[in-house]
Amino acid sequence: MFPRRLLPASLIVLGVLFGASAQASPAHGQAFGKPAQAAQASRSIEVVLGDMYFKPRAIEVKAGETVRFVLKNEGKLLHEFNLGDAAMHAEHQKEMLEMQQSGMLTPTGMASMDHSQMGHGMADMDHGRMMKHDDPNSVLVEPGKSAELTWTFTKATRLEFACNIPGHYQAGMVGQLTVQP
């Protein structure tokens, strides 16, 4: 039998993860753009991720432009590069907090979880598929590592690029991204 005290937490985690995986499908873009292949990029922008800062702090692109972001984590902590508006970041921060509280997100990376301890029936589920950080507008970068995100911006708007790992956005790890017409 599934312990009663674990049921509410498990249902919340499953709801967040199923919702996130539906939104994370590569076929799904955002209102402001969509993922692209690096070969389609008209230019590359290097972004340094430090402990609680981005360099540069502001980026300008043009509507219709495809940009390859080359991300270098020079900090000692795991960081995220996520494109979106303030409301999107606030929502994603809730998901990241769930991941941290579940033990999946550590200060320096993603941990694997032993779901066999979660109760009857849970061990047979494909948790590896469910618990992923794979939104197309976001990438996690471990300390000392590099990653890339290529994006086509489809309309003029004001966005942010941010790290939504719990506490990082609040500590100032957010930059302005302006999409010019």
From Swiss-Prot:
<dbReference type="GO" id="GO:0042597">
    <property type="term" value="C:periplasmic space"/>
</dbReference>
<keyword id="KW-0479">Metal-binding</keyword>
<dbReference type="Pfam" id="PF00127">
    <property type="entry name" value="Copper-bind"/>
</dbReference>
<comment type="function">
    <text>Involved in copper tolerance.</text>
</comment>
<dbReference type="GO" id="GO:0005507">
    <property type="term" value="F:copper ion binding"/>
</dbReference>
<dbReference type="InterPro" id="IPR000923">
    <property type="entry name" value="BlueCu_1"/>
</dbReference>
<protein>
    <recommendedName>
        <fullName>Copper-resistant cuproprotein CopI</fullName>
    </recommendedName>
</protein>
<dbReference type="InterPro" id="IPR008972">
    <property type="entry name" value="Cupredoxin"/>
</dbReference>
<keyword id="KW-0574">Periplasm</keyword>
<dbReference type="InterPro" id="IPR050845">
    <property type="entry name" value="Cu-binding_ET"/>
</dbReference>
<feature type="binding site">
    <location>
        <position position="168"/>
    </location>
    <ligand>
        <name>Cu(2+)</name>
    </ligand>
</feature>
<feature type="binding site">
    <location>
        <position position="163"/>
    </location>
    <ligand>
        <name>Cu(2+)</name>
    </ligand>
</feature>
<comment type="similarity">
    <text>Belongs to the CopI family.</text>
</comment>
<dbReference type="GO" id="GO:0005886">
    <property type="term" value="C:plasma membrane"/>
</dbReference>
<feature type="binding site">
    <location>
        <position position="173"/>
    </location>
    <ligand>
        <name>Cu(2+)</name>
    </ligand>
</feature>
<keyword id="KW-0732">Signal</keyword>
<feature type="signal peptide">
    <location>
        <begin position="1"/>
        <end position="24"/>
    </location>
</feature>
<keyword id="KW-0186">Copper</keyword>
<feature type="binding site">
    <location>
        <position position="79"/>
    </location>
    <ligand>
        <name>Cu(2+)</name>
    </ligand>
</feature>
<dbReference type="GO" id="GO:0009055">
    <property type="term" value="F:electron transfer activity"/>
</dbReference>
